[in-house]
Amino acid sequence: MSTVNHYLGNPKLKKANIQIDFSQEEIQEVVRCSKDIVYFCETYQKIISIDEGLMPFAPYDYQKEIMHSVNENRFVICKMPRQTGKTTTMVAIMMHYALFNPDFNIAILANKAATAREILGRLQLAYENLPWFLQQGIVEWNKGSIILENGSKIFASSTSCLLYTSPSPRD
């Protein structure tokens, strides 16, 4: 692949508005991934493990259940303890939604901007490790947001920042 097709010289990212010739197998994979979030995650999602470094995401059954639940319901509440892979699962869900739902807006909100950016960084790492035929072209890619050529947008912000920037009522 020519460097002309890379987003800002990053060989792992596809630039927006370039023509890609898909094989029949790639088309079938895109369709299958768009319909089955668990298959997409198990087959193409990469995560960082403290012990093993970059590795395929192998979700546990409860994580698969969360994926299906979020996919099928507008509102989901998960009562879970710390360190159970909630963030990893949600990053996978966010990436699936952004890729396969045009004009989808995703806000990653946390109590601190650095935490929200760290979660966005996990999503960016996973995105960079997708095969090109699954990637949407990149319109914007930075520490605080991503815009894909299908119109999907992902941004990271602190909740405290939102409080300070919201308009205050005046008499």
What are these regions (language model features)?
Residues 2-166, 170:
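Phosphate/NTP-binding elements of NTP-utilizing enzymes
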